[in-house]
């Protein structure tokens, strides 16, 4: 099984994803680590990625996931078509949607320095977000341990 922890930047994908992978004893994969240099440069310049930027990245992630038996992937996966591309050819993918309101996420982003995701891109991420229909939905205003415990319980069902 692959668990994809998804949501906008600042929702806690990496933090919760790493903790979940530790809890389950699964491999953790951060999608951000697999962006090509051109994507990183574009985001660092405050420009949102478009589909042409994303497809090769999503294809790379899909290839990595196909090699895994059990893994947690932290990935924005904002649109349904991106999620479809990620899951293509994989037997079981569970989506974990980290949901938080704009003000909460903005305050989190203001407190951190992401290597290439300026907080100015948050509005474009919320605008692009297509919440998944079938997902484990987690309210990220709860603490990390509570979020991880809730996700682990749902994945065990």
Residue map of PLM features:
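Conserved substrate/cofactor phosphate-moiety recognition/catalytic segment
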Residues: 18-60
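Loop/turn-to-beta-strand initiation segments
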Residues: 68-71, 94
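P-loop (Walker A) phosphate-binding loop of NTP-binding proteins
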Residues: 8
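Hydrophobic anchor at the beta1->P-loop junction of P-loop NTPases
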Residues: 5
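Conserved phosphate-donor/acceptor-positioning beta-strand/loop module used by diverse small-molecule
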Residues: 89-108
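Walker A (P-loop) ATP-phosphate-binding motif of ABC ATPase nucleotide-binding domains
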Residues: 2
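Conserved lysine of the Walker
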Residues: 13
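Small-molecule kinase domains that catalyze NTP-dependent phosphoryl transfer to phosphate-bearing small molecules
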Residues: 111-150
